[in-house]
Amino acid sequence: MYSEITKCRISKSTNLVTVLSLGDQYLTGVFPKSVDEEVTKGPVDLVWCPDSGLLQMKQSYSLDEMYGDNYGYRSGLNASMVRHLEQKIRTLERLVKLNDNDLVIDIGSNDATSLKAYSGNHRKVGIDPTGLKFKEFYTDNITLIPDFFTAEKFENNFPSDKAKLITSI
């Protein structure tokens, strides 16, 4: 199911202007196992808050339903996706000087394809609520946190560390 905001997510202002309404839509990341299985659908509206300038979704859907066990993507199966992610990591390595033991994090790491593309000896962490089903594709030098990313979860796992680089696609 879903909930709807009545205040801006940043400023808490109630001044919200509807910019786009797509009507009822099915959750696109849900893949039913049979034609009889119900898939949640609901409104998709973008609202803008002139007070903060934030364009935001009016609705929030259940994360567990959107990103449950039937969700996930194996980037490693698609050669063009692997090349794209490797190029992305090469670009980031040129922009950010990474040293050995620097902490790099990929939020929504799927099958760890991005993390495997790093060329250095870094501490690599994948955070993904569906990661367990792809665990076999994680090499021994990649830590998987099979959960949704929150600052609190990160701090619980790395209380005295700061990530040098964080990615999410």
Regions found by a protein language model. Name each.
Residues 21, 106, 128:
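Acidic active-site catalytic centers that drive phospho-/nucleotidyl reactions
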Residues 99-110:
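Conserved class I S-adenosyl-L-methionine
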Residues 12-15, 100, 120, 162:
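Short loop/turn motifs at secondary-structure junctions
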Residues 111-153:
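Class I SAM-dependent methyltransferase SAM/SAH-binding core
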Residues 83-101:
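Conserved alpha-helix/loop element of class I SAM-dependent methyltransferases that forms part
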Residues 1-79:
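N-terminal juxtadomain amphipathic helix
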Residues 164-167:
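A conserved beta-strand element that flanks and buttresses the S-adenosyl-L-methionine
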Residues 152-161:
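Short amphipathic alpha-helix with an adjacent loop that forms part of the alpha/beta core around
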